[in-house]
Amino acid sequence: MTLVGFPKSTLAALAVTTLLAGCANTFTSPSGRTVTIERTGYGIAHISAADHEGIAYGVAYAHAQDNVCQTAEHLLTVRGERSQFLGAQNTGELGLGRLPNTQIDLFTRFHMNDAALVTAASSISADARASLRGYVAGYNRYLRDAGANGLPDACRGKPWVRPMTQADLSRTTEMSMIQGGMGALAGAVLAAAPPVAGTKTGTTTVELQQAIAEIARHSFNANPEGGELGSNGWAFGRNATPDGRGLLLGNPHFPWQGTNRFWQMHLTIPGRLDVMGATGGLSPVVSIGFNKDVAWTHTVSTGKRFTLYELKLDPTDPTVYVVDGQPKKMAKTTVVLPADSAPGATPAQHTFYTTDWGPVVSLPRAGLGWTATTAYALRDANTLNTRSLETWMAMGVARNVAELRSAMGNQGIPWINTIAADRDGNAMYADLSVVPDVSADMLKACAPSPRAAALLNAAGLPVLDGSRAACAWNRDSAAASPGLIPPSRMPVIMTTDWVQNSNDSYWLSNPHLATGGCHRHDTTLAHPQCHHGNRRSTGWNRWPARQPHGLGRSSQRDLSQQESCRHAGDGRLGCSVYRQRRRAHAGPDARLPHTHSLGPYERQRREGRTAVPRVLAQGQGPARCLARAFRCGASGRDPIGPRPDYSDNARRRVQGTG
């Protein structure tokens, strides 16, 4: 039986071979060109093909076998059709949080711009374009093969299970890119509306002080219904391993449900690609994985992906803002949704307002509402980031950590760190994610009001003066996209010792960064301040490393998450990290249940006690400390419980011989 899989433009027909335990069905095209999907233990899909289009075709087909209902529902999300098919008042997943379906649809239809996405992706490689075509064709092929009645119970016979389009797939990527910024603040975008004459606007001094105090106590969460992602990763170089090769331990903490759930696969293009690992969302590439030469994992970066801009409004018209003395009219977009199927339902609609900085938002919990004189706009650095596919395609064929670093040079990594090791015994930590090019000096110079500075210190919300064009993000010609910090000024550690990261600032990834003379506290995103050997690390501000025993004092921060440390009184580097905002697991507490369960850490998190001490070193040498699974420490005690021995834990060793 011949299965024709590719679009008509493809010269050769495509066949799919599916091998299951105890059952093998082979389909071959007349041309002999095939995609093979082999299922081994635990249902892991091993997919091989002659090119990237075939690989993506097989990935989409196999992923749909396991996740077709989830995929079909996610396509409703990115199309803005949830309320039409699933009910207006029911909720759905948007990025890391949940919102009513109507709100999701309104936001999605407003934000998604298919023409802009096509333009942004116009420069991607031929292999990347072929991969996108193959993925769409593979998913649609599965729908044809299964038929409406051959789907799982959750979506069998449902009218909302429809073929995927290229625009749909581009939208799913965009949704993944913005979930650390615009997506997390979708509720704030929807909440923005011009003030009504005669109603109270503004925030009194007392109210503002109360709001800031509340934010400082509980940490600002733009989406209270949302979740957070976090992971742990350790990479050991030849100085820290018995055989002199690289060793990687990846401990990712992503959800068990939804589009961020990992799906494992093994991809092979003979002579070109042989990579295994996991992907999240609708993606034809391995995002965390290994080949015979190098292995990598990811953690969540502390960098910011957006800034807010405080707008000075025309006192006679709250939809007119002023930049350098010149009035500008906000763009007005009204989105109308089709009525859902409920009896008597009426179409929902919402009007959005957009500035040159981005859409207007309202964050009343932070004291950032829309008044007669002031409004706030959001600029997200990951909007129209279509570079990620090429990044992970290149990572899959890297032969060492240096090539892995080069693969990330196009700045497609949206909001994560990379920890890696290679067969030659090299280890790497890199934050080459997308971060706005805004220095600490600029944060200070462009702070529009004391309120903005207070929000930065208390909640990590960067607010710039939108009434001055000079407060636009710096444009460095070395950046992949205007307004980003270029890779040459982002933090990278290349070492034969070890690195680790647990969603913390880069300087915590190896004690040498904390003790090797990098004690200035004017670190900015725009200027290198820290050195690791001959390599520079830049970016994330931190608390001063040389303080008396006890809690270090705060220093001026840039677009990073705030960190703090306690230091041993005898001068040893016993450093505890206080997670003031991100509540994902930190350091060696990876053994604890993740936030989907009510383990000890989750109970502490819900009680507001989110500080998890972590010892980086204690005079015995960092490699020895890590080799003993973090058992050495300044106090010798763990506040939550004894630390287990990780020596028998599952580890990913770099493959290969010679």
Where do the language-model regions lie?
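Substrate-recognition/specificity elements adjacent to catalytic centers across diverse enzyme folds
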Residues: 27-259, 270-272, 276-281, 285, ...
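Ordered core of a single globular domain
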Residues: 384-389, 394, 398-412, 419-422, ...
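Bacterial N-terminal signal peptides that target proteins for export
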Residues: 1-12
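Compact, glycine/acidic-enriched structural inserts
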Residues: 273-275, 279-346, 393-395, 450-462
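Hydrophobic alpha-helical segments
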Residues: 374, 411-527, 546, 577
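Hydrophobic helical h-region of N-terminal Sec-dependent signal peptides
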Residues: 12-20
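Short helix/loop capping segments that flank catalytic or ligand/cofactor-binding pockets
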Residues: 56-57, 244-245, 256-260, 265-266, ...
